[in-house]
Amino acid sequence: MGVGGTADFFYKEAQRLGYVARSAFKLLQIQNQHKIISPGSSVLDLGCAPGGWLQVACQSLGPFSGGGSVLGVDTKKVKVPPLHCDSRVQTISADVTTLPQQRLKALSPKEKGFSVILSDMCPLVSGITTKDAALSFELGMRALDLALGSRIQLEPSDGVGVLKVGGHLVIKLLESEDAK
């Protein structure tokens, strides 16, 4: 796993708690600090493989009776993890870089968009940190484009993008020494 003890700790802790990946702890920390996902939220998880963020998102929706939904999108076919997820979680296999906003919006509850968009998309890592960070940035920009539309709108009622007005957007990026 990682070279340091911290990575090994989170890997083992994820296994112990039933998370499919240690990345679940990143979203747990964000959720604990900022409460971005509430009961009834509609969540879009871009780059959802292997499913750790799907698990945390579903948990954060609270009891099943509170409603809400989670849609995961990834180029890989992702099975909904059996632990920490229920029928509110669905996944599709699609390439986010070519997926039209209209298709994503059509997959949202009542076709009105999502209240939370999460992006944990990661490029195929080459090991060249500057290149990997640049590719990660491109994926982050695609998430931003899907969320808000291809240009900044002055009127929030324009309906461009799949993020609802007042919604939350989380984008995880790789970094390099050059990009800091």
Predicted segments, located by residue:
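Conserved SAM-binding loop of SAM-dependent methyltransferases across substrates and taxa
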Residues: 50-65
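Conserved Class I SAM-dependent methyltransferase catalytic core
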Residues: 129, 133-180
